[in-house]
Every structure is written in C-alpha cells, then in structure tokens.
Amino acid sequence: MVREGEEHIDEEFSLGVIGVSYRETALQQREQVLQFLQQAQLSFYPKFPQEEGRSVLLSTCHRVELYGMATEAIFSTLEKEIREMGAIPYFYRNQDCFSHLFCVVGGMDSLVLGETEIQGQVKRAYLQAIEEQKLAFALHFLFQKALKEGKVFRTKRSSPSTEITIPAFVQHELQKQKMARSASLLFMGYSEINRSVAYYLQKQGFSRITFCSRQPLSLRSMDQVLREEVCFQDPYHVIFLGSSELRHAFPRSLWEGVWDFPGRLVFDFAVPRALPVQPACRDRYIDMEQISDWLRQHQKEVFPLQLDSLREVGYRYWESLNRRLARRRYASV
C-alpha cells in the first residue's frame, strides 16, 4: 500500500529518470555510469530521519537508471557529468518518466523484446530502495503501478515470442566452438540469468552442470560446489559468471587460474564485469558487450500498438498521481 508524503511536483521539482542503455552506450561506459550514479544517489538520500528518500537505482545487464525526485538543475548536472564520461544519457521527466518505466517493466524497451526477467529486476531495485530509505510517495506510486501493469500486460496481451535470448546466444556460441554435450559447465552464482541459461542448456542435452554458491542448494539433476571448495584448475570446459560481486568474493590467485584449463570458455554476464583479470584469449571470453551485439543484430521490431498501450497506461497513472497529491495538499491547508 503506497503511503502519501508531503512532496509536490511542479515546474522546478520533477519526478524523473536519467540513465544509459545498450542502445546508446557501450559496456565500459555503462560500468562507469553505474559507479557515478551510485555516488550521485547519495545526494538524493534524506538528511534527517524524518525525511523521505527520493531515488531508486536500477542496474541490469543492459541499462543503468536513476529514478528520483529533484530539481531540473540537479538532473541537468547529472546529465552533463555523464556526457563527460563519453556516454550518451537520456532523461525523462514526469509523465514521460511514467511511460518509460511502464515500457521497461513490460519488456518493450528491452534488447530481448518481451523478456520477463526485467520485471523481477525492477522489483528488486524498488525493494532495495525501501530497505535503505523511507521512500517518497511518488516513487512508491510509480514503481508499484508499473510493476502491477507490467504483470497485467504480460497476462492479458500476447507478447511477441522470440528465440532471440541470452540462453539462445550461449547455445549458438557453444555450437560455434564445437562444444560437446558432455562438456562440464560451471555456473558461478545462483543468479536469475545463470539459472535461465543452465535450465535452457539442460533441455538441449547438456547434463554435466554444476552451480557454485555460498549456501547449499536444493538442485535436481545438477551438481553443486560451495564457494570455499571451488577450484578453477578442475576440468570445467565452460564457466559462467553470474554477478559482479564475484569479483571480490575470491582471491586474485584463484582468478588467475581461470585460463589454466585448455580451450575453456568464460561467459561474463555481470555489469560491472565480474572477471578481475585480463582474458588470456579474447575469443574465449564473452561479456555483455558481445552478447548485446549479437542480440541487437537479431532483434525483433517493437510492436507499436503494444508500446503505445503501455505508454497510455503510464500517462493515466501520472494524472492519477497528480490528483492524489493535489488532494493531499488541499487537505493540509
């Protein structure tokens, strides 16, 4: 249930989103923008316990976005500093911020058109913001309604079906490298992307699948190794890196052994990239930049009617938010 605060939105004070995505900005710049926005987010945090926080940071494989309530001057400063990094940011305010997030959650702004993973990624970003700060009502309203309508969009409308997915790319790459179905696969981390790839490959006939995680897992027909037991000298033909925190989870000496096994492939799904050492062989290391390039080449076109319908829903909720805030201000007079 959203809780209304005392905030207001006017010509100077906007509800907005600033960010970069796969469309305009390369992986290296997205990594830099993520670090910058993580620091910039601190300026949106409440200075006193009774104040409300005014930001949500969304970071995925293909986009980095900061949603917040601030003056135009603050957003302009952020945009300028991001451009100085060589990245190309976008900024949407008020009703356009609503329509943008609704399209993002609905999978209509994704590299993999109609993907479902983004719904969970947005929800986790929202829940993390709630844990860290008492969030302003307008941001509660924006994210709760976007998550609700994203789910409705998928259940009531037929999203475009596609085999142009990250798991499909992985299978394509394994076939190109002539990787046998008997190859041993190690998934570092039980992340959503690792799970989706593992179960996809299992259906394609790969049976020697191992997950490495902090805690014991309940896995059927798959093996597990705990973090303290993993060794890259073991004969894993393919290693999948599922999250950025892996970079700091193991000593550098362990990482340096990642290329010791001849012919090994490493897929790095993380942004920022998880591998802390230079690849010994570039054609054996595949990061999200290469994956994004392949997905972009095979990308399906957006369905205009579905995109427009999501935007219209976002606009209606923007108008609803303004009515709610106006009633709140009127009641306090």
Swiss-Prot record:
Substrate binds at T60, C61, H62, R63, S110, E115, T116, E117, Q121. The keyword NADP applies. GO terms for molecular function: glutamyl-tRNA reductase activity; NADP binding. It catalyses: (S)-4-amino-5-oxopentanoate + tRNA(Glu) + NADP(+) = L-glutamyl-tRNA(Glu) + NADPH + H(+). This is Glutamyl-tRNA reductase. It comes from the Bacteria. Its EC number is 1.2.1.70. Pathway: Porphyrin-containing compound metabolism; protoporphyrin-IX biosynthesis; 5-aminolevulinate from L-glutamyl-tRNA(Glu): step 1/2. InterPro entries: 4pyrrol_synth_GluRdtase, 4pyrrol_synth_GluRdtase_N, GluRdtase_CS, GluRdtase_N_sf. Possesses an unusual extended V-shaped dimeric structure with each monomer consisting of three distinct domains arranged along a curved 'spinal' alpha-helix. The N-terminal catalytic domain specifically recognizes the glutamate moiety of the substrate. The second domain is the NADPH-binding domain, and the third C-terminal domain is responsible for dimerization. It comes from Chlamydia muridarum (strain MoPn / Nigg). NADP(+) binds at G189, Y190, S191, E192, I193, N194. The active site is at C61. The record marks H100 as: Important for activity. Homodimer. The gene is hemA. Keywords: NADP, Oxidoreductase, Porphyrin biosynthesis. During catalysis, the active site Cys acts as a nucleophile attacking the alpha-carbonyl group of tRNA-bound glutamate with the formation of a thioester intermediate between enzyme and glutamate, and the concomitant release of tRNA(Glu). The thioester intermediate is finally reduced by direct hydride transfer from NADPH, to form the product GSA. Catalyzes the NADPH-dependent reduction of glutamyl-tRNA(Glu) to glutamate 1-semialdehyde (GSA). One of its GO terms (biological process) is protoporphyrinogen IX biosynthetic process. Pfam families: GlutR_N. It is an enzyme of class 1 (oxidoreductase). Belongs to the glutamyl-tRNA reductase family.
